[in-house]
Amino acid sequence: MKTKLPNFIEIYRQLIATPSISATDSALDQSNETLINLLGGWFRDLGFTVEVQPVPGTRNKFNMLAKSGSGAGGLLLAGHTDTVPFDDGRWTRDPFTLTEHDNKLYGLGTADMKGFFAFILDTLRDVELSTLKKPLYILATADEETTMAGAKYFSESTALRPDCAIIGEPTSLKPVRAHKGHISNAIRIQGQSGHSSDPGRGVNAIELMHESITQLMALRNTLKERYRHAGFAIPYPTMNFGHIHGGDAANRICACCELHMDIRPLPGLTLSDLDGLLNEALAPVSARWPGRLTVGELHPPIPGYECPREHQLVQVVEKLLGRETEVVNYCTEAPFIQQVCPTLVLGPGSIEQAHQPDEFIDTAFIKPTRDLIAQVVHHFCHH
């Protein structure tokens, strides 16, 4: 049965050749259905049972869950099927043709992170799945690069409770156990325009925004004083004012002003707590100027994430790799998968190549990644 499976490079080639771009712009956004069916077929060839799940609220996107073995616990290996869009002018190769050159495999999704599924499939062809004492699950998600809709839907809808999960994002095979979250908001003030010669007849949105920013800067200090995590290089939540726009002329009272800002919360500071703090900070402005201040999301929020250092998963992986787990500054699906079971982020390829023209993965990762997958499957599914 396993002979049906193409070789490692051919699997990789077909994954890269199947476009699965996710983008907020519907003109660039693509369904991942073809890729999901390709993966589903290969996992069935290995003897897995495969379930394909439409992801609600998306443009024809799907998750795939493959399962081998039965009982409680076990291991979940997870990854996303989508890639970012590419800038045609900056790529020197065809993004959808796997190109091997100078010990590197080039192509869109080679590192981030379609390639991870090639590593899983290639490793599992040599594993006798009938001997597993605990189940092995493979999760392929949709829309990680935009809304994380696939991972969110899985975590909200699944009844599965594996012992642990590994998400194969490109961490250069360094295990990651924590990262900050990310929220980005638009603060909008609706004033009342008028001629600057008669200030009393208008409501100046820029002045109200000044009041709002004063409140937000006080919140920034509160966050810095109240929340600490020594693991991070910047050990407190950050707040940034990134873009502001308002008004149209020096002699007009500004009718509208909008500020775009972001906050990067530490693990343990929940999105609802953060929302509460934000609303509390802006409440005095809203009270003074009813109906004039609104807060809207620019992107779906991502919570912070942390897998406890003392968890068995952390201990086992640190021992296998001979290195300690790290914390990072980028966001992944880990906070959502962590709601299902303890989760680490660990995979081949470098984050430096993700979202870059001429994206590649170094072939030096091939053997250690195969070894690692075989070891974690053996440890969590055979014992």
UniProtKB/Swiss-Prot annotation:
A Pfam cross-reference name: M20_dimer
Catalytic reaction equation(s): N(2)-acetyl-L-ornithine + H2O = L-ornithine + acetate
Active-site positions on this chain: 82, 144
Database matches in InterPro entries: AcOrn-deacetyl (IPR010169), ArgE/DapE_CS (IPR001261), Bact_exopeptidase_dim_dom (IPR036264), Peptidase_M20 (IPR002933), Peptidase_M20_dimer (IPR011650), Peptidase_M20A (IPR050072)
Swiss-Prot/TrEMBL GO biological process terms: L-arginine biosynthetic process
One Gene Ontology cellular component: cytoplasm
Pathway the protein takes part in: Amino-acid biosynthesis; L-arginine biosynthesis; L-ornithine from N(2)-acetyl-L-ornithine (linear): step 1/1
PANTHER family given in the database record: ACETYLORNITHINE DEACETYLASE
Functional summary from the UniProt entry: Catalyzes the hydrolysis of the amide bond of N(2)-acetylated L-amino acids. Cleaves the acetyl group from N-acetyl-L-ornithine to form L-ornithine, an intermediate in L-arginine biosynthesis pathway, and a branchpoint in the synthesis of polyamines.
Assembly with partners or alone: Homodimer.
Name this protein carries in UniProt: Acetylornithine deacetylase
Gene this chain is encoded by: argE
